[in-house]
Amino acid sequence: MKKSNFETYRGVINQFDINFNCLKESSISRILEEAMIFSSSLIQKTYDEIIETKILNENKRVYIEPYSSIHVRTEFIELNKNKIEIIHSIYLDKSHFNKKIELIICKSFIVNYSDKEPYKFLGNERKKNLYSAYKGIVRQTDCDQMSHMNVQFYFEKHSTAIKNLFNEISIPFKKNIAFTVKKERCIFSKEVHLNCSLEIIFFIQYVEENELKLSSKFYCLDNKNISAHFETIISFETESNLIEVINDIFLSDKLTYLNKFNFEKLRKLSDKRPPKTINKNAFLSCKKAVNTWDLGFDLMGTSQFKVGCVSDAATHFFTVCGADYNWRTKYNIGSAALDYSVRYYKCAPLGMAVSMYSNFTKIGNKSLKFIHHMVDDASGDIIMDIEIVAVLFDLEKRVSMIVPESFKNKANSLLIEN
């Protein structure tokens, strides 16, 4: 048995992954480790041990710019019923400065399985009108105490997927096409856990002049379901034939593991969106600053940084209403986000100090709706706002719970009419 043409990683190299424009050994090891875990999801078996490794080919002279796209192609060769050779090849993608796809390293792994069940490969299909923008795993650093992926890492992986798309869009123009995410909405569907393998797939809702609206699905290979749905509005610089380039990319055949091709529009937000201005009774829920490790490809604070601030703000916000650490620990209570709707207004450069101001916009029997505004401490300008629908969650029973009256009473003092 020999199977090839599987993509087991698609991501972006950041400034910390390279040294003198070459991929670091530590980054190569990390990428290959992710590809191995992704491969286990593909064959639906976890190996017991790696019994042999061998570098088959390596090019240490591949010149890599920060935020270039890379991918891993994988081949499987069955040696016997409990032994398989997995060959991973890391490639630098074609780009506006790199005229061809270049092999960085090809490495063989021979792995052993105690499970004698036959290998059951997940199929991949060629489809049009979509773009497979990201393939990777849920890492330990992405997870909370229950080994579920934290909210900010959905946004981090989605940001990587968007950068991969625009790296390909930029190829004909011989420069990086500048773009800005204006709005981003995420509806969470199913939890994903440590070492789950994910693919992010884009579909165009519309593209016109200098604006693109995308629908996205986070497909979990292990659970064979959609874990999250995104809608994103992106503005980009105007270039001749750019819209044609975007359409051509989506019309070309793309390999995907997604078994259902159905991109409905997300349900509309209920109630009127609160204004951009901060309410006079808003609660100061978080103070942060943009550090070097918070910067993205544009040298500004990333969506991961911003949504990470939101997670901290929500903890402080719920604590002031009585859902503090002691109460949550005593009754084994957590919280779960259902819907995030973000509007980005300004960038957050290195060294900017920001504050989060929070209000409830609706307090239901089980659900809570609230808004956070991120503010530049120096100028008072609004950086972004985000409206969230969430529930308190019984961690033992795995169900949402009725909001306690004591919580409601305190939350009502922070409620704004909407």
Regions found by a protein language model. Give the residues of each.
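Short, basic/aromatic beta-hairpin or loop at an interaction surface
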Residues: I43-I51, P172-F179, W327-S335
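HotDog/MaoC-like acyl-thioester-processing domains
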Residues: K2-R10, K54, N59-H71, E75-Y134, ...
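Glycine-rich, pocket-lining loop/helix-strand segments that form or immediately flank
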Residues: F109-V111, V320-Y325
